[in-house]
Amino acid sequence: MDEPIVVGVDGSAPSLRAVDWGAEEAALRGAPLRLVYASLWERYEGELIAQELNRPVEEVMARDVVGTAEARARSRRPGVEVTTDVLAGEPEYALVRESGTARAVVLGSRGRSGVTEALLGSVSLTVAGHAHCPVFVLRDGPEDEWGGSPRIVLAVGDKPQDAAAVRFAAEEAELRGLPLEAVRAWRRPSGPFTGHDAGEGDPEEAAREVVAEALRDVPDGVATLVRTPEGHTRDALVEAARGATLLVVGAHPRHGGFGLQLGRVAHGVLHRAPCPVAVVPEPA
């Protein structure tokens, strides 16, 4: 069976955006689309039964949510094979399990009110940090901000030899017919003994060399752009992502925890990026 594009749905506006993105991604990759609703309704509402259907109320609601999502996906991409499922369990752990047999997972995430309005929900962060496949996260916000300057933005980290994120970004660029913009920030060493005469070389040139190495195996048909701004990596990526179609970042295994855990850069751009973000797990 072909690996599906899995979309987590809950009936919210961000999750419907995720359905749209998932349908497009499935069409681009020739993959089936799987729409999943997960909840602990059995634990909390087992005694509350929808009388006319003899089923828990939230299960009835869940079936309605996935039915609406299925109709939306079929309308958007009629040629894509669509299946649905309602799972009993914690949404984040259900979706991490789904990621083990998926080509990618797509999630929508709402902002919160007040001072934390730009922060992501725990489900998106948990899945992005522990999934076995790439995870697209679409934050709530004005959709017309996406794609004003259509391109795929790639965060080039300290380990360009870890090529999973590069390959994924290049695939997205090739499938969508968009340029690939590789970004690596740099900072000039500070202190009285860290000038150019100390032997460090030009930090911007070093950043360009790292980017060139990362892009070495990108297909010839993909146009590439290079951006090496001075400053903090997270801030540089958020700025580069303005108007972009997608920002791609890698996630690396970390010892002392379950599976992948997001580093500061990936965590930061998931909270702040003005466009969809794809988190791609790199092999250990």
Predicted segments with their positions:
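Glycine-rich, Arg-bearing micro-motifs that act as flexible, cationic patches
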Residues: 107-126, 246-272
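General small-molecule cofactor/ligand-binding pocket signal
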Residues: 34-36, 83-87, 136, 181-183, ...
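Conserved N-terminal glycine/acidic-rich loop preference
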Residues: 16, 20-23, 27, 33-35, ...
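Acidic (E/D-rich), amphipathic helical modules within compact regulatory domains
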Residues: 25, 82, 92-97, 103-129, ...
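Intrinsically disordered or low-complexity boundary/linker segments at protein termini
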Residues: 1-17, 79, 103-109, 125-167, ...
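Structural beta-alpha unit
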Residues: 1, 14, 53, 71-105, ...
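A short acidic, glycine-rich active-site loop
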Residues: 53-64, 199-209
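Small/aliphatic-rich secondary-structure junction motif
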Residues: 1-52, 150-197, 216, 220-223
